[in-house]
Structure formats: C-alpha cells, structure tokens
Regions:
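Nucleotidyltransferase catalytic core that binds NTPs
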Residues: 1-126
Length: 126
C-alpha cells in the first residue's frame, strides 16, 4: 500500500487525521499507518495553532516533517492547513464515521510535549 503507483483521487473514500503534529512523531506515524488501512488515502489536517500555547512549529515546517516521515506514501496523503478546530459536530446520517484508533500502550506513551522539552534541552527548539 505504498504510494509510488497510486494516484490520489478526491472522489475515493478518504480518511481524515486532524491534529497539531507539534512535532510529527512515531506515535503519529503508527496512527497514520492504521488509518491508511481504512481507505487507502489520508487527508492529514494541520490545525492552525502556531504561537498558541506550546505550538512552536508553523504549518510549512509541520507539512515538511510529515512529508519527510511519509515519503513512501506521498501519493496517498494530502496535508492541509485548517482553522484551530476544537469541535467536530455532525447531524444524523451524514455518511461517514468518527472512529477512535487505539494503539498499543508503548505507542500511547509517546508524548509530543516531552519531545519538545527534549528538543529545547538539546538546543533544537527555542
């Protein structure tokens, strides 16, 4: 299911990932790989949160990091900037599912907050 021969099609069923991705890490990677199994293509939506709370990375940096991490899936992903979405609401019979993907305990322990703290200690982030 890698991306080389695949051609993105907006009409095909598509899964959505919504998040801050500050920064993209192995937990996000595993989540992406599980979500990709659902439909074969994923729209990764990046909330516009640069400068809000502890969100040091701008959209272009986040997008670059995602594409670098997912280069083998490049034709199966779109990365889009969206407003700072905090609520997802829907009416009945909308034609899509909202699903929680539960990953293994080790993956769930990965913390972007701790990653940012380590990056600051190493001088890689202000």
């Amino acid at each position: 299911m890698k991306g080389k021969e695949y051609i993105w099609n907006n009409k095909n069923p598509t899964a959505q990932m919504l998040g801050r991705w500050q920064p993209w890490h192995q937990g996000h990677q595993k989540l992406f790989e599980e979500i990709l199994k659902k439909t074969g293509q994923v729209n990764i939506m990046v909330r516009d949160v640069k400068g809000v709370d502890d969100n040091p990375f701008d959209f272009e940096t986040v997008k670059k990091n995602i594409f670098e991490a997912l280069k083998e899936y490049k034709n199966r992903i779109k990365v889009t900037l969206v407003p700072n979405i905090t609520n997802i609401c829907y009416g009945r019979g909308v034609g899509y599912k909202i699903e929680e993907i539960v990953l293994d305990e080790k993956t769930q322990q990965i913390s972007a907050t701790k990653i940012r703290e380590q990056m600051r200690k190493e001088g890689k982030l202000k």
